Amino acid sequence: MTRLNPYFGEFGGMYVPQILMPALIQLEDAFVSAQSDPAFQAEFSDLLTNYAGRPTPLTLCRNLTAGTRTKLYLKREDLLHGGAHKTNQVLGQALLAKRMGKTEIIAETGAGQHGVASALSSALLGLKCRIYMGAKDIERQSPNVFRMRLMGAEVIPVHSGSSTLKDACNEALRDWSDSYERAHYMLGTAAGPHPFPTIVREFQRMIGEETRAQLQEHEQRLPDAVIACVGGGSNAIGMFADFIDEPAVRLIGVEPGGLGIETRQHGASLKHGRTGIYFGMKSPMMQSAEGQIEESYSISAGLDFPSVGPQHAYLDSIGRAEYISATDEEALDAFRRLSRHEGIIPALESSHALAHALRMIQAEPEKEQILVVNLSGRGDKDIFTVHDILKARGDI
């Protein structure tokens, strides 16, 4: 059986308890064989098209760029069934779980989007599903919690640590250590132990492939830059993957700047963390001086993660991709501007990427450029959060 490289440069690896090694090796073998199995690929493709609704549109913004020479396109992952890009790769992983004879799915979720995607794919394919979610995230994402339960998933609150995504990940891994013979751990981002970063990238890469084909149709050329938010990094690596070998295309990842990098209330682990071992991988992460994992912070639950996928760390280390941050305030402003001027309510996660695109446009209004923002999810789940913030300010 072909073995995949577990590393991206110095980043990645399989830093897990010995008990989980057979499960990871079984998963890698199943993935490698599925990649060359026409029947698996046909079923995956059929689900993406006829269940999830691919391809998603590439929408040209009509109003946000008025008075500039920029063309700003949005890759509309918000229109995918389930409301975000998460649906792509969970369908692939659910099919892998069935292929391996597993009957249960374990997942973690922050914003609830991966939880919803895990629940819908489990319901579709007849798998039992339990989802770990930080108690704090359950409070701020109640619509998604109800959606998960409606589709038959058990949602398990996690009260340890910061009661957010980091802690949900830890609990999910603990569960998997006890149940891996019957359960598949459906990791929600392009991070964690090998082979998850590679599997998730490959099951998300249609985002960039479609973008390239659609832009070729609209503009007959490649974009100048593709921009995506980065928490763990799955939507970004899905967008970047097809453009990595195109040096003329800038790859820009936008981390959560929270209340400002100087406050340490942020989640910008790639540019402001240190390399260490966490969540089964070697990658940059937010650490205290003593090397303890620090709590991350973001207005966006889905970006509230103290590390980042190893391929992003590698792309940063070789200078192929650029990583910057956008603050809560900048994301909130982008959220409101897209809603007001284009009639599209984006997820707060995606709003970070949009915020940086708007900064780029504002900095060089006379520059002729084509930018693509991966609108990774829709903002229905965030309207109560935004409403409460604006109400407290007397701004609605």
UniProtKB/Swiss-Prot annotation:
CDD domains: Trp-synth_B (cd06446). The keyword Electron transport does not apply. PROSITE patterns: TRP_SYNTHASE_BETA. Disulfide bonds: none annotated. Pathway: Amino-acid biosynthesis; L-tryptophan biosynthesis; L-tryptophan from chorismate: step 5/5. Belongs to the TrpB family. This is Tryptophan synthase beta chain. It comes from Sodalis glossinidius (strain morsitans). The gene is trpB.
